[in-house]
Amino acid sequence: MWGFGGGRIFGIFSAPVLVAVVCCAQSVNDPGNMSFVKETVDKLLKGYDIRLRPDFGGPPVCVGMNIDIASIDMVSEVNMDYTLTMYFQQYWRDKRLAYAGIPLNLTLDNRVADQLWVPDTYFLNDKKSFVHGVTVKNRMIRLHPDGTVLYGLRITTTAACMMDLRRYPLDEQNCTLEIESYGYTTDDIEFYWRGGDNAVTGVERIELPQFSIVEYRLVSKNVVFATGAYPRLSLSFRLKRNIGYFILQTYMPSILITILSWVSFWINYDASAARVALGITTVLTMTTINTHLRETLPKIPYVKAIDMYLMGCFVFVFLALLEYAFVNYIFFGKGPQRQKKLAEKSAKANNDRSRFEGSRVDTHGNILLTSLEIHNEVASNEVTTSVTDARNSTISFDNSGIQYRKQSSHRESLGRRSSDRTGSHSKRGHLRRRSSQLKIKIPDLTDVNAIDRWSRMVFPFTFSLFNLIYWLYYVN
């Protein structure tokens, strides 16, 4: 019962309000009252001086701003800028434009903006901007009964964005939009973000081919110049570059070309045409990739991350070509010449030895020795012990001054020969063991097959290590 009575009371009190609203709406749309609206607008504009700001001589005008971002069209590393399309709204109160008798907001033609005072807002880091003009100039003026003015524009601006490309393309960039008053100082005008952190909308709708918007920040501050302090609002975007495009377009081709250059290690070393053609092709391909990349980036003095990677791949490809040059030199150049010289020297030594040994015994059966041989025998341990005993051997001189040694007895000769042979065998065994150890530690660089075998292991290992260090450093 009480609920039914309460509903009747609410209906009784709400009915006049609804009637008043409907009557006001009808009165505005009534052709007879359109003249009243026209007279109101004419009255507002009559005597209005756009040269003076609202509350001239009084407190500064507070201008609130909203931005609805339509799109970020382009981020250019070459020009160091980005292009932004947005709906830019400014709010302020002008008591000269307050009106009564019409309980509605008045949305006027965009040409009325030329007859009203508007803030002298400009974009500090702007390079090129324009207000869209299809089909009419995209700007709006809306008046509120209390004198609040909404001034909206659809703007496309290209703003400067100074980028640090040292970690390109694994980088993050910070691009800002600086909004400032050109002529009015903080004594005349103040800027603020209308709605606080919600003053900028549409960021979540933005999709960029190469970037992702990590976050955005709103900043309000005053900056001081020689002519005074000016209000400034900043909208800052933190952009993280998407690596997927560069992996497919740059990194993967470079890796595959580097691996392709290693195929020459499995090609026979005497196939010069195949190995040289493969090496030169891979080097030229890496050069083409480097050239194309430099055309898409500005001419900056420091080295970028992608430059380091491409330079590393180029070095590996170039070293693979040099490896075959070294193999070719060993096989066709230095190696055969050295072997020929060694063979000639060995044959000459054998001939000299056989001829010399035939002339070392005189007619009496004595073995002729040179002074150098006697010195060597005296210096050795075996000869020293035998020289101390005068009964073992006798050294004499003939009339020509040539020293000779008489042959010892058969038993002494056999004993001395066996001891010499044992000592020489032990020395040879020791030298052979040392040489085998050195061969295990150091590969024979005169063997072209060994060079190719080692290259098959060393090149992939070092390239994998290079990739590990590169990605750990730049990703983290």
Curated annotation (Swiss-Prot):
Give residue ranges on the Extracellular side: 26-246, 293-304, 474-476
Q: What is the phylogenetic placement of the source species in the record?
A: Eukaryota, Metazoa, Chordata, Craniata, Vertebrata
Which intervals of the chain are annotated as region Disordered? 402-434
Per the UniProt entry, the glycosylated residues are: N33, N105, N174
Q: What is the top-level taxon of the source organism?
A: Eukaryota
Q: Give the InterPro entries listed for this entry.
A: GABAA/Glycine_rcpt, GABAAb_rcpt, Neur_chan_lig-bd, Neur_chan_lig-bd_sf, Neur_channel, Neuro-gated_channel_TM_sf, Neuro_actylchol_rec, Neurotrans-gated_channel_TM
Cell compartments where the protein resides: Postsynaptic cell membrane; Cell membrane; Cytoplasmic vesicle membrane
Q: List GO BP terms, alphabetically.
A: chloride transmembrane transport; gamma-aminobutyric acid signaling pathway; inhibitory synapse assembly
According to the record, the signal peptide region is 1-25
Q: Which GO terms describe its molecular function?
A: GABA-A receptor activity; GABA-gated chloride ion channel activity
One GO cellular component term noted in the UniProt record for this chain: plasma membrane
Where, in residue ranges, is this chain on the Cytoplasmic side?
268-271, 329-450
Name this polypeptide is given: Gamma-aminobutyric acid receptor subunit beta-3
NCBIfam families (UniProt xref): LIC
Q: Does the keyword Glycoprotein apply?
A: yes
Reactions mediated catalytically: chloride(in) = chloride(out)
> How does the record classify its membrane topology?
Multi-pass membrane protein
Which residues of this UniProt protein bind 4-aminobutanoate? E180, Y182, T227
Q: Give a short account of what the protein does.
A: Beta subunit of the heteropentameric ligand-gated chloride channel gated by gamma-aminobutyric acid (GABA), a major inhibitory neurotransmitter in the brain. GABA-gated chloride channels, also named GABA(A) receptors (GABAAR), consist of five subunits arranged around a central pore and contain GABA active binding site(s) located at the alpha and beta subunit interface(s). When activated by GABA, GABAARs selectively allow the flow of chloride anions across the cell membrane down their electrochemical gradient.
Fetch the Pfam families from UniProt. Answer: Neur_chan_LBD (PF02931), Neur_chan_memb (PF02932)
Annotated Basic and acidic residues bias: 409-423
What are the cysteine partners in each disulfide bond?
Answer: C161-C175
Keyword Transferase annotated:
no
Report activity regulation: Potentiated by histamine.
Comment text on domains: GABAARs subunits share a common topological structure: a peptide sequence made up of a long extracellular N-terminal, four transmembrane domains, intracellular or cytoplasmic domain located between the third and the fourth transmembrane domains.
Give the binding site residues for histamine: Y122, S181, Y182, T227
